[in-house]
From Swiss-Prot:
Gene designation: HBA2
Domain Globin: 2-142
Native species: Equus quagga burchellii
Full protein name: Hemoglobin subunit alpha-2
GO cellular component, one term: blood microparticle
Keyword Heme: yes
Length: 142
């Protein structure tokens, strides 16, 4: 999916509002995913998945950092996310559907925290962005 110039502007503006909260929002999205889609917990058998756990917060920071990296490389997402794609495809073997589930939870989290900025156009742009990130992360599965 190709991001238009307007999409890129919307994504950068929205992520700019996220600011230093990317890790917190990532952790919140993970918690939402674990609650709403309990089968996703199977990829984290060694984690304490309780609310506010240090392990979920640490992984949320990784998610937030990866998305921040992606926002900074909207014109070369495959290059920017190549190592993460390798990790998830070859080492972790995460089922690709889980990226869609986490994307849904990220959108919900952003809508809660950025209600005035989460317009239909921004929602659509963020959805396209997260879908593109998911596609890149699953590209090495083939």
């Amino acid at each position: 999916m190709v991001l238009s110039a307007a999409d890129k502007t919307n994504v950068k503006a929205a992520w700019g509002k996220v600011g230093g909260n990317a890790g917190e929002f990532g952790a919140e999205a993970l918690e939402r995913m674990f609650l709403g889609f309990p089968t996703t917990k199977t990829y984290f058998p060694h984690f304490d998945l309780s609310h506010g756990s240090a392990q979920v917060k640490a992984h949320g920071k990784k998610v937030g950092d990866a998305l921040t990296l992606a926002v900074g490389h909207l014109d070369d997402l495959p290059g920017a996310l190549s190592n993460l794609s390798d990790l998830h495809a070859h080492k972790l073997r995460v089922d690709p559907v889980n990226f869609k589930l986490l994307s849904h939870c990220l959108l919900s989290t952003l809508a809660v925290h950025l209600p005035n900025d989460f317009t239909p156009a921004v929602h659509a742009s963020l959805d396209k962005f997260l879908s593109t990130v998911s596609t890149v992360l699953t590209s090495k599965y083939r």
